[in-house]
Amino acid sequence: MKQVRWFSCIVVVLFLSIFMAGQSIASENMPLADGLYAKLITSKGDILIKLEFEKTPLTVTNFVGLAEGTKDSNRGKGVRFYDGLTFHRVIPNFMIQGGDPSGNGTGGPGYNFPDEIDPTLKHDVPGILSMANAGPGTNGSQFFITHTKTPWLDGEHTVFGHVIEGQDVVNAIRQGDTINKINIIRIGSKANTFKADQDSFDALFTQLRQKKQ
């Protein structure tokens, strides 16, 4: 009887292990909803972010254009701007910051663009992707991802995405860790027709500047 019970327990444990493994694999392979995504491949792991390209088109055009090298910058035409840069600033229980080619918080792409604040996008949960700046209208290439909700940043920094996978990686990032590569994923007709080149950036820049006047 004892052998039968032990065998039954082993079967149950094996079944649960296989089931849980299957659930984990299924969740990892779940298809993404239509949208525009950025996959940050870092030295600590991958971070998948959904970009708010409809609510903050200029900011997302800038980010995607720099990531893919389809937009002009001071790193050279056609260069994937973010690849190989570091997270130069990390404040525990606050945020991680990257996107500076100088590596010390003073650099950028060679230009600035206006804030693009959408009141429906807030720093209200962990994993918010937002633009770093040195005051109004000083956005460039630097961005940060939050560890926790940071409501005092609302209205001061442009929120343009949020983490949907890899918040544990965000929390594990330390100063000096590397952004190996940023891949942009387009799913659905709207995302596939979204352009992130210099002409698109210039047109959106002009529209936003006129709107603010």
Residue ranges and their predicted role:
Residues 2-9, 15-213:
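Cyclophilin-like peptidyl-prolyl cis-trans isomerases
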